[in-house]
């Protein structure tokens, strides 16, 4: 009986500790959001409508527009969708950059949710299967963070294969983990009054299982795009 009582006592203390931690977290969030982050900052930036469509040997025939409902669902403030072509490669590379001026839920939530949607969650819903998924160091010139990481995926739909790179580029950071994105949004909201950020994604076809050429095409185009991004995605 003594052992049972002792076990119940320990379980009770553990429950109290968890409750206190939860309450402390709620209080800290309330204080942070309502006192330290009362006046959000929105850095100056250029609109993606001004982004150059010719980058050396790479060219894009024109920016692609998404329908308004999709834009609302994604919560993007501004975006760029472009299919870059180069005569040296037998396909185009899809480049998407979605900029969110704020990632704070608007009053009432719902359609006011502005946080960045992880591509790994959306791809299966559009019919693509993720057959390889890894986190890699993204050592490409033009990035603000030389220690940044990206998600590298191989996706498939029927016989089609694609190489996908994506990462979150927000307030000078380059990160791939969803939980880090959430943590830094809260931290920067409190300390810098900023929650702006972007999702950057490159999608490259893989033909005849030639993943090496797809990788080379990505490494060829990416530095040219990234060198121009600071004007559109502020550090």
Question: Where are these predicted regions, by residue range?
Answer:
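N-terminal Lys/Arg-rich, disordered targeting/topogenic segments
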Residues: 1-11
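Twin-arginine (Tat) signal peptide motif
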Residues: 12-16
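Hydrophobic membrane-insertion alpha-helices, especially the h-region
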Residues: 17-33
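Active-site-proximal structural scaffolding
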Residues: 21-25, 51, 193, 218
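Alpha-helical transmembrane signal-anchor/signal-peptide segments
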Residues: 37-55
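Short beta-strand-initiation
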Residues: 46, 77-79, 148
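Short extracytoplasmic
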Residues: 50-83
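A cross-kingdom signal targeting lumenal/periplasmic-facing segments of multi-pass membrane
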Residues: 81-228, 232-233
């Amino acid at each position: 009986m003594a052992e049972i009582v002792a076990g119940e006592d320990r379980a009770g203390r553990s429950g109290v500790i968890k409750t206190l931690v939860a309450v402390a977290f709620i209080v800290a969030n309330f204080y942070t959001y309502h006192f330290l982050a009362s006046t959000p900052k929105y850095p100056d930036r250029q609109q993606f409508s001004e982004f150059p469509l010719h980058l050396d040997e790479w060219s894009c025939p024109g920016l692609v527009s998404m329908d308004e409902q999709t834009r609302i669902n994604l919560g993007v403030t501004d975006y760029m969708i472009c299919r870059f072509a180069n005569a040296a490669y037998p396909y185009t590379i899809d480049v998407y950059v979605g900029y969110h001026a704020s990632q704070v839920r608007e009053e009432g939530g719902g359609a006011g949710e502005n946080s960045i949607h992880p591509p790994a969650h959306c791809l299966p819903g559009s019919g693509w299967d993720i057959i390889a998924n890894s986190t890699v160091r993204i050592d490409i010139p033009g990035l603000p963070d030389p220690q940044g990481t990206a998600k590298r995926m191989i996706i498939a739909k029927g016989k089609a294969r694609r190489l996908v790179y994506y990462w979150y580029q927000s307030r000078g950071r380059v990160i791939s983990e969803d939980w880090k994105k959430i943590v830094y949004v809260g931290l920067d909201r409190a300390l810098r009054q900023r929650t702006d950020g972007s999702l950057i994604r490159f999608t490259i076809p893989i033909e005849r299982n030639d993943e090496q050429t797809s990788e080379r095409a990505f490494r060829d185009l990416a530095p040219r795009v990234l060198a121009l991004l600071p004007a559109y995605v502020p550090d």
